[in-house]
């Protein structure tokens, strides 16, 4: 029988010591987000003299194929999985988004939170002829990057980037943007805005029977009040899709699909 070497014993001891940390990080995946967004990213920005979002755009412009949305998505996914983590919906959870757009064939689609334009490109590439996507982004730098990403992908005619806060823009959708009701809403902005904006969409008469809400990151960072509402109000039929945090293989996350049943609908069993 082989005697354990000091190096092997040290590695085993280190592994045991790190197990609680690994469990903690798996359970509290927001620490991964905090580490990337609050520590690594500011250091990288300082050293590089630009922002992560600008670096993502530059990488796409240099390495993706112009006019090819799939190439744009794959280039962003490769960068964010290999170089710098970013809060896109990502390739794995993006498949749920693809499925909703393909199933619903929406005429009017709303996105809350554009970030760098990844999900806008992902949805717009699947829209049927004549359909349109409105994407609301509060950060002017992100909105500008999203527009450039859409232009590069050749999707600028299908998407309108709206700069502003969701709570300010939503009440303007009917009159200013000629929206009657929405077919699909993708929520991927501030998680504490998921519930207020869902209620605002209802209040403004923008949801019809069958409107699909798809909400990202309902586990990490989490949107418990939103989940409680759509699952408990009786006005939505919900399906949860378990997955992992974007560009992570071990932080459990999920996407919630909530189909609007109409006001005053009976509670679902």
Swiss-Prot record:
Cofactor binding, note field: Binds 1 Mg(2+) ion per subunit.
GO molecular function, one term: magnesium ion binding
Keyword Nucleus in record: no
Signal peptide: none
Coiled coil region boundaries: none
Binding residues for S-adenosyl-L-methionine: 89, 111, 119, 137-138, 164-167, 188
Membrane-side (Extracellular) residue stretches: 26-269
Membrane topology, Cytoplasmic segments: 1-4
Broad EC category: transferase
The keyword Methyltransferase appears for this protein: yes
Keyword terms: Catecholamine metabolism, Cell membrane, Cytoplasm, Lipid metabolism, Magnesium, Membrane, Metal-binding, Methyltransferase, Neurotransmitter degradation, Phosphoprotein, S-adenosyl-L-methionine, Signal-anchor, Transferase, Transmembrane, Transmembrane helix
InterPro entries the UniProt entry points to: Catechol_O-MeTrfase_euk, SAM-dependent_MTases_sf, SAM_O-MeTrfase
GO cellular component: axon; cytosol; dendrite; membrane; plasma membrane
Job of this protein: Catalyzes the O-methylation, and thereby the inactivation, of catecholamine neurotransmitters and catechol hormones. Also shortens the biological half-lives of certain neuroactive drugs, like L-DOPA, alpha-methyl DOPA and isoproterenol.
Name of the protein in its database record: Catechol O-methyltransferase
Gene that this sequence comes from: COMT
